[in-house]
Amino acid sequence: MKPIAAFQEYLEVERQYSPETVTAYLSDLQEFQAFLKANGGFTDFRHVDDLDVQTYLTDLNKQDLARTSIARKISSLRSFYRYLTRIDVVKRNPFELVELKKQHHHLPQFFYEAEIQELFKTVAGKTPLDQRNRALLEVLYGTGIRVSECAKLTLNQVDFNTALLLIHGKGNKDRYVPFGQYAQQALRTYLKDGRQVLMAKSQAQHRYVFVNQYGRPITSRGIEYILDQLIKQTTLTANIHPHMLRHSFATHMLDHGADLRTVQELLGHASLSTTQIYTHVTMAHLKNEYMKYYPKHN
């Protein structure tokens, strides 16, 4: 089996990564291979040396890519070569010691609570799509799960008796996330009415919770499109991205006194340091409010 095909099987079977994650890895490997072919020829991954790596890094930097994009590409290649060393295809990993300059961390964008209320006013209708969109917003904002996790949510992962969602997270790690009365009510209405109507349009039977207008399972990109359309119905001007509801959930939980480790568990973060970025968000929010309303600054 060729190295890339073997690595793909490893990611899918052993690591059980999502199709989106596997596709991202393979895209990075193929891009590196294409670069080598265009710059001196490519013979075999076993013959890649430090000079090849440095030349590729230089080219990436010249493309004016975001640091996060470069870091992801290097991470993919490092993981690939770790796998090749593990199965004794190569003796050393040429990407093992590659380091990028430290990134300046931008604080996550989030909705203020008043903005959340305005956003929810856009899904007050009773059509099947309104019911779906209401349930979608309630679940995303009320649980903080990732958009990809929401898209993959199935009926057997929803337990109304315990008010818990079983979430299959990154790295094949499962966690239980509670969902409150608003999400429960919205989900019950959608599953009883709206989803039934939408599913009647599809010949395929499946157990995914959220479906598109044709009754087919919704995708992460589909959720992003829905959010974009809902935002256009409001006065909000922020550059919206799907994770803003997740960021808003974490920020508002901390604002209202939630313990940091509790938020970490709910978000499914492997490291507490990942969750701590939201404490900086809340502090920045407090400082902005202070500067805005403190009498000496008015």
Swiss-Prot record:
GO terms for cellular component: cytoplasm. Keywords: Cell cycle, Cell division, Chromosome partition, Cytoplasm, DNA integration, DNA recombination, DNA-binding. SUPFAM superfamilies: DNA breaking-rejoining enzymes. It is found in: Cytoplasm. GO terms for biological process: cell division; chromosome segregation; DNA transposition. Transmembrane segments: none annotated. Residues 106-291 form the Tyr recombinase domain. Residues 1-85 form the Core-binding (CB) domain. The active site is at R146, K170, H243, R246, H269, Y278 (o-(3'-phospho-dna)-tyrosine intermediate). CDD domains: INT_XerDC_C. GO terms for molecular function: DNA binding; tyrosine-based site-specific recombinase activity. Pfam families: Phage_int_SAM_1 (PF02899), Phage_integrase (PF00589). Site-specific tyrosine recombinase, which acts by catalyzing the cutting and rejoining of the recombining DNA molecules. The XerC-XerD complex is essential to convert dimers of the bacterial chromosome into monomers to permit their segregation at cell division. It also contributes to the segregational stability of plasmids. Forms a cyclic heterotetrameric complex composed of two molecules of XerC and two molecules of XerD. Belongs to the 'phage' integrase family. XerC subfamily. This is Tyrosine recombinase XerC.
